[in-house]
């Protein structure tokens, strides 16, 4: 049995994934962020965290395991640290929020740590 490979360019694949997320009520920017991360994982050879997970995310969003429009909130915060409740967001979205907060803290205070 021979395997067939199909070349799929990154941008059309990203756009497809984004449309899937948007169809289940994920805001456009969050859909784009998540789609870009999935495709980049595949491009880096980390297939376990790539587009193959799209069905799992779709099912999780439909079943309420993940929330398409999460209400993320800061639980605790100091000048250099924060604890962020991701609100059952897609991990890529919550991770980006936490990373952005950590960078802002580091720019202001020299170091920043955020736990999501």
Predicted stretch roles:
Residues 1-24:
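Generic N-terminal amphipathic, Lys/Arg-enriched alpha-helix
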Residues 20, 83-88, 112-116:
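Short glycine-rich or small-residue beta-strand-to-loop segments that form or flank ligand, phosphate
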Residues 22, 39, 107:
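Short polybasic/polar patches that bind polyanions
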Residues 25-33, 48-50:
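Flexible, glycine/charged-enriched surface loops at secondary-structure junctions
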Residues 42-48:
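Secretory-pathway/luminal and periplasmic proteins that interact with or process carbohydrate-rich
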Residues 49-103:
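Active-site cofactor/substrate anionic-group-binding motifs, chiefly glycine-
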Residues 101-114:
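Conserved catalytic cysteine-centered active-site region
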